[in-house]
Amino acid sequence: MDDSMDYPDRDGDDLDQFQGTARSQVVQNQPHDEEVNLSESESFAGADEPPAAPRDASLIESHDMDEGPAAPARTLSPTGYEAGKHAPGGIANSDEAPPGAYNAQEYKHLNVGEDVRELFSYIGRYKPQTVELDTRIKPFIPDYIPAVGGIDEFIKVPRPDTKPDYLGLKVLDEPAAKQSDPTVLTLQLRQLSKEAPGAKADMVGRLEHTDENKAKKIQQWIASINDIHKAKPAATVNYSKRMPEIEALMQEWPPEVETFLKTMHMPSGDVELDIKTYARLVCTLLDIPVYDDPVESLHVLFTLYLEFKNNPIFRQHMEMENKLDGMSGGGGGMMGGGADVLGL
């Protein structure tokens, strides 16, 4: 028997709709179970989107499906609801470009060379690298702990009995880590106060015989006394006559004078002259003026001698000249005669 005779007469439109043999037709005011507001871009599905499943499968199963399997139904449901991000359980398309992103289709019509087109191709090839930085917080012990220091040396913690201790005013305030030697401290204060030497009895440093660090303390004592003598200001002398500056006397002599000094020797102390005349002669050779009293001129001479002696440049120069003199057996050089006179 022909299978087509088993089907009862039914509306051809319904059969075409469910069998999928007739063309699709949009039905206005189609009844539906749920209403969703969609935008114009989401109203109709695109050609590349797959057909979505029907919203309610019971509508299809309500027809006579007992005689045989029916063809898959074609529905006209809005694709924005099923395939979009607003559908229940739907997954949004992660490949969609964000708004304002670079689109290669917009720049295909440009009239540019192949090299420029190749540059545009690098834009699409670029893939940014995502670098995740791990934030690690590690406990640590700081090397230095900030603390508020002494604002003023005269601001001290008061005594428990509320009596003034005058620390820093009447009693010398020193750090407790390294105490000063009382004898050295007294000499320093005496030097600063410029008291008369005989005003107070001299303090003498003492060391215990059983002290283990006796040698070290002796070296510290010698170094402290040397520092006191170095810090002592030079004596101030007011000359009655005008004297040249020490820096001017230390200047290099003219070349002709140096040439002359190389060919002759300065008078030594064996010359038959009294001390006053010999002092005048030496001061005259060094461009130091000599007046009736040669004491001030000799003071300038000895000051010049100390400047040459303490100057490291001249000291090194004179040591080299002395070595050369010892090797050659003669004397000469810059300020050679002056050095002989000054004893350098």
UniProtKB/Swiss-Prot annotation:
Disruption phenotype: Individuals have short, non-motile flagellae. One of its GO terms (cellular component) is motile cilium. InterPro entries: Intraflagellar_transp_cmplxB. It is found in: Cytoplasm, Cytoskeleton, Cilium basal body; Cell projection, Cilium. The keyword Cytoplasm applies. GO terms for biological process: axoneme assembly; cilium assembly; cilium organization; cilium-dependent cell motility; intraciliary transport; outer dynein arm assembly; protein stabilization; protein transport. Residues 1-16 have a biased composition (Acidic residues). The keyword Secreted does not apply. Keywords: Cell projection, Cilium, Cytoplasm, Cytoskeleton. Residues 1-100 are annotated as: Disordered. Residues 18-30 have a biased composition (Polar residues). Its main location: cytoplasm. Component of the IFT complex B, the core composed of IFT25, IFT27, IFT46, IFT52, IFT74, IFT81 and IFT88 as well as associated subunits IFT20, IFT57, IFT80 and IFT172. Interacts with IFT25, IFT52, IFT70, IFT88 and DAW1. Forms part of a complex involved in intraflagellar transport (IFT), the bi-directional movement of particles required for the assembly, maintenance and functioning of primary cilia. Plays a role in maintaining IFT complex B stability. PANTHER family: INTRAFLAGELLAR TRANSPORT PROTEIN 46 HOMOLOG. Belongs to the IFT46 family. This is Intraflagellar transport protein 46. It comes from Chlamydomonas reinhardtii (Chlamydomonas smithii). The lineage of its organism: Eukaryota, Viridiplantae, Chlorophyta, core chlorophytes, Chlorophyceae.
